């Protein structure tokens, strides 16, 4: 029986030796008593030393998923953005951590380029290529040639499969509705606007329907379940939240 898991906001772990292919990755566990581990995390300010990499690595993850805000770099200066990613990527503990791991990821607003930004951010295509460079995405990968950083990888472990579906909640996201009082945003009218955009929705539906994995993990950089805080969330697009629930 297929199982779908939705990873909402951000924070996680990952593990193991991998052999890279575009969409299918075979993982060999060190021994039969070691669990296959996926780790994920987000909100990692590049100017503050991250002391957690060794602790995460001690869980022997085979896969690490960046969940967004991988750097804090609200800017329209792409050199500044590149430099901040370089600071992050050249951290000695991070370099040790990513050795022999599969690295996946998406962005959120502060690494996309502007606070709470969506489709209107004018440097989104340039920012996309910089993120893909940071993740080590091959230059001939399809993610390089299409709009948005959404991606999928299927991990094969002892003849079992885990499909990881990483969404992009920035590139196509239309306008939000301003909230009242101490709430920054409120839900759009039902049916108004989109979070993922038509192309990404079609891709997501196809990836889920065609999956033969035992587990399907969906990664979103913004919260899915929480809808009371008045900040960014799937709940600001109630029709798309409902659509994803039905799809799962």
Residue ranges and their predicted role:
Residues 17-248:
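Metal-dependent phosphoester/phosphodiester hydrolase catalytic core
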């Amino acid at each position: 029986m297929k199982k779908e898991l939705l990873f909402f906001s951000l924070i996680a772990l990952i593990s193991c030796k991998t052999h890279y292919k575009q969409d299918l990755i075979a993982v060999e566990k060190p021994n039969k008593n070691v669990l296959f581990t996926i780790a994920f995390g987000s909100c990692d300010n590049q100017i503050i030393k991250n002391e957690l990499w060794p602790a995460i690595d001690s869980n022997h993850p085979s896969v690490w998923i960046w969940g967004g805000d991988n750097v804090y770099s609200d800017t329209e200066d792409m050199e500044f953005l590149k430099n901040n990613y370089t600071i992050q990527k050249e951290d000695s503990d991070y370099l040790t951590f990513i050795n022999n791991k599969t690295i996946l990821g998406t962005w959120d607003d502060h690494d996309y380029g502007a606070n709470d930004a969506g489709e209107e951010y004018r440097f989104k295509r340039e920012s996309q290529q910089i993120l893909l460079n940071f993740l080590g995405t091959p230059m001939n990968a399809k993610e390089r040639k299409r709009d948005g950083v959404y991606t999928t990888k299927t991990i094969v472990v002892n003849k079992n499969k885990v499909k990881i579906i990483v969404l992009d909640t920035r590139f196509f996201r239309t306008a939000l509705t301003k909230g009242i009082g101490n709430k920054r945003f409120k839900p759009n009218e039902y049916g108004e606007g989109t979070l993922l955009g038509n192309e990404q929705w079609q891709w997501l539906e196809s990836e889920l329907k065609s999956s033969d994995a035992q587990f399907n993990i969906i990664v979103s950089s913004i919260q899915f379940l929480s809808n009371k805080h008045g900040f960014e969330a799937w709940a600001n697009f109630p029709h798309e939240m409902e659509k994803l629930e039905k799809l799962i």
